């Protein structure tokens, strides 16, 4: 039996993790800790789990922790858990910056613990099919990838008071919070880029950027465009991949498009087709099915049960953050940044 404690409900994804852990065989959600006692007590009551206000006692009560705090708290919480030898599941992004990410890396290595970075798109069959289309060569040589990822919460009145828009606690705005999903897909599928040119602004007047665009250039000539926003009232196509032999378009995989996009969600075209029209796929993105953020928790628990390395690593988290950190450097300097 694996005992897991959730450390903080600051990020709403903790609710999905709790649901997943409670449904998993041979897993016990042993404790909830939160530096906000009212928030932690409410979550514990809702899920029927003990609230443990003392962090060390919460860590002692478990075999593994799931960290879902404000991003700035990731490093200190992981350091405490790693020192106690506890495995860690960490909400994205891994840290507010690369210095904090290095702290986490040192703690994980020194503690010799299992670490899993949360990137839910890694478990979506739609993501795997896009990656297969690239890796198989069906689309030919890839010249351009466009990823638009964002939501509409920035348009709601209370969003300006939430920790997500406090740079001291979140580390950044849409480019970090939303863009890191795109960065991970690019790293996973194409590897690290050669350079980036980026721009960001706060069209809504938030303390962090609510709109951002980053152009990543790869050594083979491919360009990847990432557009991130907190202010998409609605959207459709989320990922576009253009190759020398074909195109793939995917919709419904971000909050801006999830509820408004209609199937087919994945469409492809290859130049060898007799009829020049889209070929629809029957795949429905996991995000549309409502069992999306749960997959990280399920995979984490499964890896611990089997005694295997988690499927998304510390290095995966750091690589995606590195892409975003270099993009921020480009925003600040106004020039292209080499990796």
Residue ranges: model-predicted function:
Residues 240-315:
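C-terminal glycine/acidic-rich active-site capping loop/insertion
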């Amino acid at each position: 039996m694996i005992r897991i404690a959730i450390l903080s409900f600051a990020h709403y994804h903790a609710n999905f993790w709790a649901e997943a852990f409670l449904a998993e065989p041979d897993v016990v959600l042993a404790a909830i800790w939160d530096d906000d006692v009212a928030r932690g007590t409410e979550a514990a009551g809702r899920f029927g789990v003990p609230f443990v206000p003392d962090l060390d006692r919460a860590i002692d009560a478990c075999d593994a922790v799931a960290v879902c705090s404000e991003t700035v708290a990731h490093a200190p919480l992981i350091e405490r858990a790693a020192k106690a030898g506890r495995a860690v599941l960490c909400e994205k992004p891994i840290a507010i910056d690369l210095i904090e990410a290095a702290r986490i890396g040192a703690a994980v290595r020194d503690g010799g613990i299992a670490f899993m970075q949360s990137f839910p798109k890694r478990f979506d069959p739609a993501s795997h099919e896009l990656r297969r289309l690239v890796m198989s060569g069906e689309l030919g040589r890839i010249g351009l990838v466009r990823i638009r990822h964002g939501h509409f919460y920035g348009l709601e009145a209370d969003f300006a008071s939430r920790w997500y828009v406090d740079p001291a606690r979140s580390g950044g705005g849409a480019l970090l919070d939303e863009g890191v999903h795109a960065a991970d897909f690019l790293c996973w599928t194409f590897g690290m880029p050669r350079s980036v040119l980026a721009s960001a602004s706060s069209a809504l007047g938030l303390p962090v950027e609510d709109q951002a665009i980053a152009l990543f250039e790869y050594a083979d000539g491919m360009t990847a465009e990432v557009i991130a926003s907190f202010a998409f009232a609605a959207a459709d196509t989320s990922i576009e991949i253009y190759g020398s032999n074909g195109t793939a378009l995917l919709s419904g995989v971000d909050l801006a498009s999830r509820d408004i996009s209609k199937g087919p969600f994945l469409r492809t075209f290859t130049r060898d087709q007799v009829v020049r029209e889209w070929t629809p796929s029957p795949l429905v993105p996991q995000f549309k099915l409502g069992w999306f953020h749960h997959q990280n928790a399920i995979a984490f628990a499964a890896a611990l049960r089997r005694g295997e390395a988690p499927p998304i690593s510390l290095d995966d988290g750091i690589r995606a953050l590195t892409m975003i950190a270099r993009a921020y450097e480009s925003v600040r300097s106004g020039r292209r940044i080499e990796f």
